[in-house]
UniProtKB/Swiss-Prot annotation:
PANTHER family: 60S RIBOSOMAL PROTEIN L18A. GO terms for cellular component: cytosolic large ribosomal subunit; nucleus; plasmodesma. The gene is RPL18AD. Pfam families: Ribosomal_L18A. It comes from Arabidopsis thaliana. GO terms for biological process: translation. This is Large ribosomal subunit protein eL20w. Keywords: Ribonucleoprotein, Ribosomal protein. One of its GO terms (molecular function) is structural constituent of ribosome. Belongs to the eukaryotic ribosomal protein eL20 family.
Length: 178
């Protein structure tokens, strides 16, 4: 399995100052990309579509990577997104359990690619939030909220107790059925 390794960036930019507008409006965007170059590219793509500001007439003020405050605790993340499919544009809400928001976004991208055949450029993340357990909607995230959850060992392979009893070739195939 290949890992995407997405990072969350905060990109700040604006249109170049002109005689007509000496203090142009500053735009800040949080987005996910594999590196800073792609984050800048995505920023100018969205700014060109929404605010009619092109990179040639624009100015990049700052680009910072955003890190998770508690990357060791498991949280529920809600992701609101918009994606383009063969039939048009669709809005969607997804829930994931992960230790970081970047991990949840990676899960979302892989799930959208597998279930809906929607690739990275066709997905626009509208909003993300940490969702408390009481407000979770999806059954796939709710099932892990039980404190007495158990995971059965389905693939039990009996191993020899000592190395002396280990053989290279077996007379019969081992039965792994429980």
């Amino acid at each position: 399995m290949s890992v995407i390794r997405l990072h969350q960036y905060q990109v700040v930019g604006r249109a170049l100052p002109t005689e007509k507008d000496e203090q142009p409006k500053i735009y800040r965007m949080k987005l996910w990309a594999t590196n800073e170059v792609l984050a800048k590219s995505k920023f100018w793509y969205y700014l060109r579509r929404q605010k009619k500001v092109k990179k040639s007439n624009g100015q990049m003020l700052a680009i910072n990577e955003i890190f998770e405050k508690n990357p060791t605790t498991i949280k529920n993340f809600g992701i609101w997104l918009r994606y383009q499919s063969r039939t048009g544009y669709h809005n969607m809400y997804k829930e994931y359990r992960d230790t970081t928001l970047n991990g949840a976004v990676e899960q979302m991208y892989t799930e959208m690619a597998s279930r809906h055949r929607v690739r990275f450029p066709c997905i626009q993340i509208i909003k993300t939030a940490t969702v408390p357990a009481s407000l979770c909607k999806r059954e796939s995230t709710k099932q892990f909220h039980n404190s007495k959850i158990k995971f059965p060992l389905v693939f039990r392979k009996v191993r020899p107790p000592t190395r002396k009893l280990k053989t290279t070739f077996k007379a019969n195939k081992p039965n792994l059925f429980m």
